[in-house]
């Protein structure tokens, strides 16, 4: 059987594999450690800085989540961290916040508290107030 060049990419040009059989970790496919210790550290940090969840009402969750994301900056919060901090249905809370805030969802692979690899876990980063709303507010003389 004829073999085309580069059909077997086990040499240069293919994905490098580590000893465990998975792809070698680079900056683009880094796996985030989301162990119990790391999640506890995030929750403790939020509490120390006054942005921990105070109660479970939806309105409080939205306002506190916005403050927590604002405090965390580019580090944001992923789904596991947010759930451990007390936010129920993290994606729903983020969707509600997106009505007035610009929030970016990044996807990352994590080793969860269960010790298993979870691919494509969302990490939410607050970018600021939505610019399209600012323009609409200014266009109506502040009445919106």
Language-model segments: residues:
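Eukaryotic low-complexity, non-globular regulatory regions
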Residues: 8-10
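Short amphipathic alpha-helical interaction segments
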Residues: 84-96
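Short acidic, hydrophobic short linear motifs in intrinsically disordered regions
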Residues: 73-83
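DNA-binding patch around the recognition helix
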Residues: 14, 19-59, 94-141
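Short, well-structured alpha-helical interface segments that form or flank functional binding sites
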Residues: 60, 77, 89-92
């Amino acid at each position: 059987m004829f073999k085309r060049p580069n059909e077997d990419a086990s040499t240069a040009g293919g994905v490098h594999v580590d000893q465990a059989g998975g792809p070698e970790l680079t900056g683009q496919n880094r796996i985030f450690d989301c162990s119990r210790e790391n999640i506890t550290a995030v929750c403790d940090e939020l509490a120390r800085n006054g942005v921990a969840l105070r109660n479970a009402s939806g309105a409080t969750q939205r306002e506190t989540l916005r403050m927590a994301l604002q405090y965390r900056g580019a580090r944001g919060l992923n789904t596991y961290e947010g759930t451990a901090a007390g936010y129920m249905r993290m994606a729903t809370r983020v969707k509600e916040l997106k009505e007035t805030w610009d929030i970016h969802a990044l996807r990352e692979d994590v080793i969860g508290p269960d010790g298993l690899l979870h691919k494509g876990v969302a990490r939410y980063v607050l970018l600021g107030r939505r610019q399209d709303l600012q323009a609409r507010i200014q266009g109506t003389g502040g009445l919106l």
